[in-house]
């Protein structure tokens, strides 16, 4: 899989934080999942700093979906990994509410990721739980 630049990882992580908070609960488990995503692209010593920056961006931004432009420019493998990580965060509490589903539909549409593949990723992760 290709690597992402640090600023791209932070921007995408802000989307992950947004997905985690959209149901108004931001758990330690969700933070750990986001840290795992960050670790897959950055050095271990950058993880806490990257998460902190991502949380600040999420807190201060009304335009989080602008970060989909970062995703859109990447390979299908990276897009799949990002979608998979978004779903991991969303289903970590064993529920998917309407806001979470809507967020995923919007993100997939904005990055030109096929709905069918998005649904397949979601179902695989649900079946693993």
Regions found by a protein language model. Give the residues of each.
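Small-residue-enriched hydrophobic alpha-helices in membranes
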Residues: 1-129
């Amino acid at each position: 899989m290709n690597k992402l630049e640090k600023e791209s990882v932070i921007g995408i992580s802000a989307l992950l934080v947004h997905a985690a908070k959209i149901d108004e609960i931001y758990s330690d488990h969700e933070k750990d999942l986001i840290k795992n995503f960050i670790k897959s692209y950055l050095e271990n010593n950058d993880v806490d700093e990257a998460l902190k920056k991502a949380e600040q961006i999420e807190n201060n931004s009304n335009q989080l979906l602008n970060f989909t432009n970062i995703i859109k420019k990447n390979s299908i493998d990276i897009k799949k990994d990002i979608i998979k990580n978004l779903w991991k965060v969303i289903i970590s509490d064993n529920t998917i509410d309407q806001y979470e589903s809507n967020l995923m539909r919007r993100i997939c549409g904005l990055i030109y990721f096929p709905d069918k593949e998005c649904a397949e990723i979601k179902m695989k992760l649900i079946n693993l739980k």
